[in-house]
């Protein structure tokens, strides 16, 4: 993309904003913040009008079609040649490595395109077990269980292990996948990385719940900062409380050996539950829960 392309793009945005300011009938993203008098069909139609309107000004932001595999450089619709891409979570470029592609091809040739059954009733393959053992060892845990996505790992685990007599203490910045699993249990929101408040509330609520679980991210996806993992570990041990860390954005990136946030803080083996995904640094698809053998045995039965 040359300077003229960039200049033209900026001018189109400025012109669009001017039109929005002058013409109150033009739809903007603000119109979708609160729409109390519209049903879902009306909202979706209006949003599509907004997308179409943006495209008229050369600002297509949704459903941009790629013509090559996602990487640092890729080809997309509307442009000749390659563009620099900042949209991917494939941090290490694993999805485009020849070894990764070859392994995928060999697995399909041997096993087909899917197990076509739940793991508990016949869809559990030897390569699943190998992957579970490998990822558990990699993140410093005893055992692991696989899921079809990182989102499913968080939501599925939490729905399985927490009930009405339990509670989750959650950092205010944790991922939506974790909050979506907190149905049918008690939840308390803790300020972001607020160790002192967590310490106080755990002390105050000692003996009130059967299972107490603190949920944090290793690397927070929306602002990129780290959890205060060593302090969380200390507080949870002090109050006999379980600690769960979603390390989707830390594994493969953080730590001397890329083993995640626990590796970065030299805390491998000290976090009760670690969840993650294969769709980021591993450049593939799927998710996992890694924990003690006792915890994962419960997860395999209930999930």
For each of these PLM feature ranges, what is it?
Residues 263-298:
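Active-site PLP attachment segment
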Residues 5-34, 43-111, 241:
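N-terminal "arm"/small-domain region of PLP-dependent enzymes with the aminotransferase-like
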Residues 157-176:
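Conserved PLP-anchoring active-site segment centered on the Schiff-base-forming lysine
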Residues 102-149:
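Conserved N-terminal alpha-helix of the aminotransferase class I/II PLP-enzyme fold
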């Amino acid at each position: 993309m040359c300077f003229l392309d960039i200049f033209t793009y900026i001018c189109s945005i400025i012109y669009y904003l001017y039109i929005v300011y002058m013409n109150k009938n033009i739809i903007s993203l603000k119109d979708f913040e609160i729409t109390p008098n519209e049903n879902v069909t009306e909202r979706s139609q209006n949003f599509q009008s907004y997308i179409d309107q943006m495209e008229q000004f050369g600002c297509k932001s949704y459903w941009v079609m790629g013509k090559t595999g996602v990487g640092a450089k890729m080809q997309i619709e509307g442009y000749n040649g390659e563009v620099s891409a900042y949209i991917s979570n494939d941090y290490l470029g694993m999805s485009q490595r020849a070894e990764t592609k070859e392994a995928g091809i060999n697995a399909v040739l041997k096993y087909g395109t899917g197990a076509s059954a739940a793991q508990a009733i016949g869809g559990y393959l030897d390569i699943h077990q190998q992957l579970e053992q490998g990822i558990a060892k990699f993140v410093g845990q005893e055992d692991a269980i696989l899921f079809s996505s990182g989102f499913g790992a968080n939501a599925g685990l939490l729905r399985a292990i927490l009930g009405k007599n339990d509670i989750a203490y959650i950092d205010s910045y944790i991922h939506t996948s974790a909050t979506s699993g907190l149905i049918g249990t008690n939840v308390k929101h803790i300020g972001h990385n607020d160790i002192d408040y967590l310490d106080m509330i755990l002390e105050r609520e000692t003996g009130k719940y059967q299972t107490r679980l603190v949920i944090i991210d290793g690397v927070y996806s929306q602002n990129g900062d780290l959890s205060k993992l060593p302090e969380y570990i200390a507080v949870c041990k002090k109050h006999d409380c379980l600690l769960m860390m979603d390390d989707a954005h830390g594994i493969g990136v953080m730590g001397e050996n890329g083993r995640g946030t626990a590796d970065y803080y030299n805390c491998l083996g000290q976090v009760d539950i670690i969840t993650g995904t294969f769709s980021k640094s591993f450049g593939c698809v799927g998710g996992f829960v890694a924990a003690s053998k006792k915890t994962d045995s419960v997860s395999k039965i209930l999930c």
